[in-house]
A protein has these predicted regions:
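Electropositive phosphate-/nucleotide-binding environments in soluble metabolic enzymes
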Residues: 242-246, 318-320
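Aromatic/acidic polysaccharide-binding cleft in carbohydrate-active enzymes
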Residues: 213-243
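Secreted/periplasmic carbohydrate-active enzymes, especially glycoside hydrolases
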Residues: 1-184, 188-190, 195-210, 262-339
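Proline/serine/threonine-rich low-complexity linkers at boundaries of modular beta-sandwich domains
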Residues: 1, 252-261
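Metal-dependent phosphoesterase/phosphodiesterase active-site architecture
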Residues: 243-244, 250, 305-309
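Short hydrophobic/aromatic-rich motifs at helix boundaries and adjacent loops
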Residues: 141-142, 220-225, 260
Length: 339
């Protein structure tokens, strides 16, 4: 079963105009190509059926009225596309995704056999574009990208199958507030990646509401999900062991997530030159309160767009030191035994 039927979409006046394209080196179409579009990822109801002859393969189009739009995290809706046709090939390989059917053919002298080829893939219909000096818009609504660079996990590890790892990664990124993902690389981020793996990854992203387009100018440095052994990267969100989330993960979670966040960044706890302590706390709440040994020490109000609250000159008479932080309905307590 193949998943590489080319599909481009254009939205106009509440209608979706679709154009289909066969992959390269597929062979010559010997029969009508049948294409169906079904509602929902599991194919609940047929909404389009088309048949295209070999003379029409350069202009295979479809029209959907009032399509259900894929709308990111709000509504990651996808259609199911099915297609099949018989193609003449010189040789048969597993990459044809079909069933070998030996038969004599008079379509062309160079066709030695015919293969029935099947496609099944998802279709997300949406519109994303950039308006100069205004921003990015998804389905005519402003879209603020919370984007990370993603590195595919190793094929073999102690953290389960690759698909299981990716699903777990996407769940963590969703909790962090990410809404756009780019595979590591330049441009579309897919250089050097296996095309089947890339399509499978993008399918998982679509189902979870992550945008994977490449239409806007990005900042020079994006946070990277999954560090590498021996690599020193300040923006890595996941350590090289594949299990440990870094401080930067919680920083961006406090910056991007819509869920309440309160996280004391213990690696930032250090003694100042004057002998007192300094500690950073990440939160998306309006105010953070710090207690030292049960006594109110200081509260800080949030600076615009900055999730980091830096508490300085924290007194330490002796160890262990008991700290507690509150923000909104959240609270957390710490016991410091050494510095």
């Amino acid at each position: 079963m193949r998943d590489d039927l080319g599909i481009t979409t254009k939205l106009e006046n509440g209608k979706a105009y679709l154009e289909f394209a066969l992959p390269e080196k597929i062979g010559r179409l010997l029969s009508a190509l049948q294409i169906e579009i079904w509602e929902g990822a599991e194919g609940e109801r047929l909404v389009f059926h088309g048949e295209y002859s070999s003379e029409e393969t350069d202009s295979m189009t479809a029209l959907l009225l009032r399509p259900h739009l894929w709308d990111g995290m709000r509504d990651p809706y996808v259609y199911l596309v099915k297609a099949q046709g018989r193609f003449g090939t010189v040789e048969y390989g597993e990459n044809m995704g079909g069933i070998k059917n030996q038969e004599e053919s008079d379509h062309a002298e160079d066709i030695t056999e015919a293969v029935e080829v099947y496609w099944q893939q998802e279709l997300a219909i949406y519109d994303v574009h950039v308006i100069d000096k205004k921003g990015i818009f998804l389905n005519e609504k402003e879209f603020l990208p919370h984007e990370v660079v993603y590195r595919l996990p190793p094929q073999i590890s102690g953290a389960g199958t690759r698909e299981e790892q990716i699903k777990g990664d996407l769940d963590r990124l969703a909790r962090m507030g990410v809404n756009a993902i780019r595979l590591e690389g330049t441009g579309s981020g897919t250089e050097g990646q296996n095309r089947c793996e890339v399509r499978a990854f993008y399918s998982l992203c679509r189902r979870r509401g992550f945008l994977t387009d490449d239409l806007w100018i990005r900042p020079e440095i994006l946070p990277v999900y999954r560090g590498l052994p021996g690599e020193t990267m300040a923006e890595a969100l996941l350590a090289a062991d594949g299990r440990t989330l870094t401080e930067r993960y919680y920083y961006y979670q406090a910056k991007w997530s819509s869920e309440p966040v309160l996280y004391p960044a213990l690696p930032t706890l250090h003694r100042q030159e004057n002998g007192l302590l300094s500690l950073s706390i990440y939160s998306n709440q309006k105010k953070v309160v710090l207690y030292v040994d049960g006594v109110l020490f200081l509260f800080q109000s949030a600076a615009s767009g900055d999730p980091e609250f830096i508490f300085e000159d924290i007194p330490v008479a002796k160890l262990p030191l008991h700290l507690a932080a509150e923000a909104g309905n959240l609270s957390i307590s710490l016991t410091v035994t050494k510095l």
